């Protein structure tokens, strides 16, 4: 998958290459990240997600996060290169703060938070009858996979990331699957990602073990597009972005040759619209007074389906789950969409961490969520 960045980006990179791979974002330097995360559409091909009349998010009582070590919010945001945070409780904005030169109109990339978007569109496609059942074989919708390791994998197992197909998600290895999945020779009429995934070997029986695989969410996105006959951007606009009332157009990155959108990443939206997506989920998936998702979808998608080997945590249908009932979409470089039904709470963070992920950054982000919870709980 080849994309053509601006000359300014090439200048920032200090390189002479005439184009960049989409996964080059994993290896950008800090100035590149902070410049490009707010303008991915300037560097890569994308589809527009049209918005409707904005769903109001009125101001609520101001909230000051209470960090256990006394850290201030400004210090936290500066130290971790945070572009924006928003806290919405009971449908009201209790905290909204920006950094890195971002503002209310800034569209910031979400990376793997987009996985939760794609999962939600599966719920819509089930309600519409475009997807018959989660127990359908993936090959019903993507027959090009029939000769490989995905031939016996179900839609549900893709959503759970329990296909058993071998995968390497190492963000610092330029030869890992996540770095190479948009590379290789194209076959006429076949998305490049499908060609790559069709050649992967099996490691475990389907359904036996969870392994995080961005490429599989890309397959889910292709499956939704095949089932509905619509691009992910168009379907998201039709089912959620317009009827629920997002405040601005969003963007979904795509392959500039075959037009395939990346279901596992690539959504860019404003801070407030990420919060609105969380509120849509809290509201039970209702838009314009009508249910958008299959009955019971939200409860099923946001409960633990897979053991990920972390106490108190699990994985649902492209949502990370917690034993307290909260769940979240997480993206590399610091992105977060946290939903807490018990507290009627949505927390969003957009950032440009200096690394894709590491324990120290992840712990700091988790402490930010706890700091918000302390303030909400009055403790």
Identify what each model region corresponds to.
Residues 15-103, 128-131, 160, 195-198, ...:
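N-terminal leader/targeting segments and the immediately adjacent pre-domain N-terminus
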Residues 91, 108-134, 158, 220-224, ...:
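Active-site SXXK
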Residues 109, 128-168, 199, 226-265, ...:
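Active-site helix/loop module of the DD-peptidase/beta-lactamase fold
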Residues 1-13:
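Sec-dependent bacterial lipoprotein signal peptides
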Residues 216-223, 263-286, 335-352:
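Active-site-proximal alpha-helical segments within enzyme catalytic domains
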Residues 247-251, 298-347:
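Active-site Gly/Thr loop motif
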Residues 16-27, 331-379:
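Structured C-terminal helix/loop/strand segments within mature extracytoplasmic catalytic/sensor domains
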Residues 104-105, 170-172, 178-258, 265:
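Catalytic-site signature segments of enzymes, centered on catalytic residues
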């Amino acid at each position: 998958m080849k994309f053509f960045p601006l000359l300014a980006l090439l200048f920032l990179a200090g390189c002479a290459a005439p184009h960049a791979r989409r996964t080059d974002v994993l290896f950008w330097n800090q100035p590149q990240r902070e410049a490009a995360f707010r303008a991915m559409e300037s560097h890569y091909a994308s589809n527009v997600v049209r918005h409707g009349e904005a769903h109001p998010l009125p101001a609520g009582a101001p909230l000051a996060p209470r960090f256990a070590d006394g850290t201030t919010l400004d210090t936290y945001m500066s130290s971790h290169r945070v572009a924006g945070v928003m806290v919405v409780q009971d449908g009201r904005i209790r905290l909204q703060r920006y950094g890195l030169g971002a503002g209310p109109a800034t569209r910031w990339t979400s990376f793997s938070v987009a996985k939760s978007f794609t999962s939600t569109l599966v719920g819509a496609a089930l309600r519409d009858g475009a997807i018959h059942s989660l127990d359908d074989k993936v090959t019903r919708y993507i027959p090009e996979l029939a000769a490989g390791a995905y031939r016996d994998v179900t839609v549900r197992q893709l959503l759970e990331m329990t296909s058993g197909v071998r995968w390497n998600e190492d963000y610092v290895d330029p030869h890992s699957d996540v770095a190479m999945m948009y590379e290789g020779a194209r076959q006429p009429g076949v998305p490049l990602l499908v060609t790559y995934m069709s050649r992967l070997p099996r490691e475990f029986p389907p359904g036996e073990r969870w392994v995080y695989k961005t490429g599989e969410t890309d397959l889910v996105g292709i499956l939704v597009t095949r089932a509905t006959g619509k691009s992910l951007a168009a379907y998201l606009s039709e089912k959620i972005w317009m009827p629920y009332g997002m405040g601005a157009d969003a963007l979904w990155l795509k392959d500039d040759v075959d037009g395939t959108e990346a279901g596992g990443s690539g959504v860019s939206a404003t801070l407030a619209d990420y919060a609105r997506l969380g509120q849509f989920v809290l509201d039970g998936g209702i838009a314009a007074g009508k249910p958008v998702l299959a009955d019971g979808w939200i409860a099923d998608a946001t409960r633990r389906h897979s053991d990920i080997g972390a106490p108190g945590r699990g994985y649902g249908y492209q949502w990370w789950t917690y034993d307290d009932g909260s769940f979240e979409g997480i993206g590399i470089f610091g992105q977060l969409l946290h939903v807490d039904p018990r507290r009627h709470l949505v927390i969003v963070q957009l950032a440009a961490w200096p690394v894709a992920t590491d324990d120290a950054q992840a712990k700091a982000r988790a402490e930010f969520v706890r700091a918000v919870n302390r303030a909400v709980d009055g403790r």
